[in-house]
Structure formats: structure tokens, C-alpha cells
Amino acid sequence: MSQSICSTGLRWLWLVVVVLIIDLGSKYLILQNFALGDTVPLFPSLNLHYARNYGAAFSFLADSGGWQRWFFAGIAIGISVILAVMMYRSKATQKLNNIAYALIIGGALGNLFDRLWHGFVVDMIDFYVGDWHFATFNLADTAICVGAALIVLEGFLPSKAKKQ
């Protein structure tokens, strides 16, 4: 039995496109205006810093000889497909879940594009306190983390709020 896409969670796929445009646009600006390793202070504790990540979060498996590029690409594709199916099976009114899934898909596809096109992920956000620097990350990573946090938040909401 088929149903209208607008009645399913796929109605929220526009958010995937927004995340992709913002993420890929920011990476394009970095690639066009920064040399690898360049840093520009934005605010106290926040820099723009061009870095390349050949691995995953925190450069996990970055020095593994290249196979990790395809491994992480496969994971991104798999997760995106699974979440799209979950969106299709959910109602459009289940906003929190669908927004979370769309953010994760958008972030995963943004980093997937980098892996396939460049062979690495472009990172540029450098958060620091004093001499301690958090791992450099990008807007796709931020979308993935916000999406994951929304899924966790949804788990704590009362049943009535989950349906909306």
C-alpha cells in the first residue's frame, strides 16, 4: 500500500538539502581561501582552521592506508539508507525524529561527498580553551551530533510528545 510522501517523514528531506548546501558551501569557501593549516581567529576560543581528516571522528583510522575511505563511505551510505527508510515509515508529524534523521543524513552525505571527491573530509572549526584544542570539525559533523542529540532527547520525552 503506497502513501503520499508528504504524509511520511520524507516530507523533511528538504532539511537534508539545506544541510548539504551549508556544509558543502562552507567547505568550498575554505578550500578556495585557505591553504592547508591556515588559521583565522573568529572569536575568543573559536578559529577557522583548514585541516584534512582522512579518518572518522577524532581522526580515527586516519593512518590506515586508504581502505578506511571506502569503509566510512559504506557506513555513510548504509546509515543514510536506513534513516531514509525510517523516515518513510514514520509520520510527517513526528517532527523531532524526522528532523534528527534529516540532520544525520545531511551530515553523512556532506562528509561522504568529501571522501569520494577529495579523498578526505574538510574540517575547519577549531574550538579551544587556553592551550587545549578540541578536534577540528565541520558543519556536517555538527549536524550529525545535533541529530544524535535530538534522538537521545526524544527518548526522554513523554509518549504524547514523541508522537508530535
Swiss-Prot record:
User: What is the membrane topology noted in the UniProt record heading this document?
Assistant: Multi-pass membrane protein
Tell me where it mainly resides.
Answer: membrane
Active site positions = D123, D141
Looking at the UniProt entry, the stretches that span the membrane are 12-32, 70-90, 102-122, 137-157
Task: Quote any Pfam family the record assigns.
Answer: Peptidase_A8
Its recorded reaction(s) are:
Release of signal peptides from bacterial membrane prolipoproteins. Hydrolyzes -Xaa-Yaa-Zaa-|-(S,diacylglyceryl)Cys-, in which Xaa is hydrophobic (preferably Leu), and Yaa (Ala or Ser) and Zaa (Gly or Ala) have small, neutral side chains
- Sorted UniProt keywords: Aspartyl protease, Cell inner membrane, Cell membrane, Hydrolase, Membrane, Protease, Transmembrane, Transmembrane helix
Q: Which domain of life is it from?
A: Bacteria
Q: Give the Enzyme Commission number.
A: 3.4.23.36
Family stated for the protein in its record: Belongs to the peptidase A8 family.
- Name the record gives this protein: Lipoprotein signal peptidase
What gene makes this protein? lspA
